[in-house]
């Protein structure tokens, strides 16, 4: 067996290869793309936004039951991209952590602490032989009275970080490149600008004109810190604004 081969080192999650890699964790990152979806999150001056593809894989499925966005608490929302059972498990765990915190402390769990907690759990899954890494990535958004809008990404390796703009999923690279160019030009975005930047980044990365029924857009703002999902008509309005601007 050559030292550059993964054979023998990708069978156990707790074993490093000679190159210092943990292959099972790398495979978990690849599993994020298994649903062929992409999500984009943007932090503005007074709002945080997530825009994510919505794909109904079967004509017999009720479209309203298909979603990638979830309410964790009144003020914290989350988008989970990757293997659906793993994503559902992560969401339930996050909701449980947030509910437990509020029961003990009397107020909603801060978004950063929740992201850190979920990252710690993910990291724990990378070093136990009887477990496997979870094949999904999480995007959290919230509006904090002191910190303002917040966006956090949590990955299968157990790493989390606050972001100005971020994308996860199969078209992550082109979406991230688009965000970097736009945010470099203007970093202080209004809530409307943040929403339209997230939608435009998603649309550009996909290379197609998306319809309102193909998108889910959720937002928290200074004026309304509750996690809110935009209606189809509201999404259509923003799509028209983007089209007219172009």
From Swiss-Prot:
Superkingdom, taxonomy of origin: Eukaryota
Protein name, as recorded: Proteasome subunit alpha type-6
The keyword Magnesium belongs to this UniProt entry's keyword annotation: no
InterPro entries cross-referenced by the UniProt entry: Ntn_hydrolases_N, Proteasome_alpha, Proteasome_alpha-type, Proteasome_asu_N, Proteasome_sua/b, Proteasome_subunit_alpha6
Family stated for the protein in its record: Belongs to the peptidase T1A family.
Species in which this protein is naturally found: Caenorhabditis elegans
One Gene Ontology cellular component: proteasome core complex, alpha-subunit complex
Keywords of this entry: Cytoplasm, Nucleus, Proteasome
Keyword Nucleus: yes
Biological process according to GO: proteasome-mediated ubiquitin-dependent protein catabolic process
Quaternary context: The 26S proteasome consists of a 20S proteasome core and two 19S regulatory subunits. The 20S proteasome core is composed of 28 subunits that are arranged in four stacked rings, resulting in a barrel-shaped structure. The two end rings are each formed by seven alpha subunits, and the two central rings are each formed by seven beta subunits. The catalytic chamber with the active sites is on the inside of the barrel.
UniProt-annotated location(s): Cytoplasm; Nucleus
Job of this protein: The proteasome is a multicatalytic proteinase complex which is characterized by its ability to cleave peptides with Arg, Phe, Tyr, Leu, and Glu adjacent to the leaving group at neutral or slightly basic pH. The proteasome has an ATP-dependent proteolytic activity.
